[in-house]
Amino acid sequence: RRSASDAELSAGAEGATGSEAAPPGDLGGRTRGGGRGSAAAAATTSTREAEGAERRGDTPARKPDPEAGRMDHHQLGTGRYQVLHNEEDNSESSAVEQPSTSSLAAPTVEAAASAPALDPDSPPPYSSITVEAPTTSDTDVYSEFYPVPPPYSVATSLPTYDEAEKAKAAALAAAAADAPQRNQEEDCTPRDDFSDVEQLRVGNDGIFMLAFFMAFIFNWLGFCLSFCITNTIAGRYGAICGFGLSLIKWILIVRFSDYFTGYFNGQYWLWWIFLVLGLLLFFRGFVNYLKVRNMSESMAAAHRTRYFFLL
């Protein structure tokens, strides 16, 4: 480009010099010839300079084309940057963003061809990432830690605060009423290997008669043995009844015997006291035993209780 511009400047300078050096007389005739000669000389000079530039390896300068510059700039920009499209609008953009001319198709193909070889360390494109669907185990874990709320119909049908408090009070009252009966049933659990009389520790008539005769015959010694050995109501009440009758027996023996006349002379009130005490012991043991036996037979099975009559 510099050689071509230098050639033009030199040609212009020579033409101007030739026109100034011409004499005034020959101005009219030489004007035409001088103009032609200057033009021929300029052409020859430019041709020589162009050949010299070609020999040196330089190309003659040409007028820059603005369209070509724009195309080169577009190609450089397209090759350097990659055009990305949205995945969701991929189908729509493929139909809308088509190239209008053949000049835009070539840069797009070049950009697509050069895109995979940009950088091996760059992350993969978003379209190559596959999203895994949630499995049933993840769904179960999510529902376990975050339970699903109840539907609107269930949430609106819940009782009010007053109704909930009344229901709670009724439940507490029912539990308090059932507690004594439950404790009583636990304390008095029925046993199949014993009869009802043995379960209540009432005893039977045989034990009552055995303790009665033991206390009646052996007096106070029999009373102590029968009362301490037996652990039933029949045996203890039999011992009390026999001891009372034994006391009455000895009072009558002492009163109507000639051997003990000196002991009760003038003291009749003393033997009356022992006689009444013996009668009370006899009737108390006999009546209480009959009462307990009848009560044990008439009681319901769920409300039976063990009775211990300790004196």
Curated annotation (Swiss-Prot):
Residue stretches of biased makeup (Low complexity): 7-22, 38-47, 102-120
GO biological process terms, semicolon-separated: metal ion transport; vacuolar transport
Residues found modified as Phosphotyrosine: Y126, Y142, Y146, Y152
Keyword Membrane: yes
Motif (PPxY motif 3): 159-161
Skewed-composition ranges (Polar residues): 92-101
Pfam families: NEDD4_Bsd2
Major subcellular location class: membrane
Subcellular location: Endosome membrane; Golgi apparatus membrane; Endosome, Multivesicular body membrane
Biased composition (Gly residues): 26-37
Segments crossing the lipid bilayer: 207-227, 233-253, 263-283
Region named Interaction with NEDD4: 123-126
Domain of life: Eukaryota
Region annotated Disordered, chain positions: 1-133
Listed Basic and acidic residues bias regions: 48-75
CDD domains: NDFIP2 (cd22306)
The protein's assembly and partners: Forms heterodimers with NDFIP1. Interacts with HECT domain-containing E3 ubiquitin-protein ligases, including NEDD4. Interacts with NEDD4L. When phosphorylated at Tyr-142, interacts with SRC and LYN SH2 domain. May thus act as a scaffold that recruits SRC to NDFIP1, enhancing NDFIP1 phosphorylation. Interacts with SLC11A2/DMT1. May interact with phosphorylated EGFR. Interacts with KCNH2.
Cited function: Activates HECT domain-containing E3 ubiquitin-protein ligases, including ITCH, NEDD4, NEDD4L, SMURF2, WWP1 and WWP2, and consequently modulates the stability of their targets. As a result, may control many cellular processes. Recruits ITCH, NEDD4 and SMURF2 to endosomal membranes. Negatively regulates KCNH2 potassium channel activity by decreasing its cell-surface expression and interfering with channel maturation through recruitment of NEDD4L to the Golgi apparatus and multivesicular body where it mediates KCNH2 degradation. May modulate EGFR signaling.
Record-given protein name: NEDD4 family-interacting protein 2
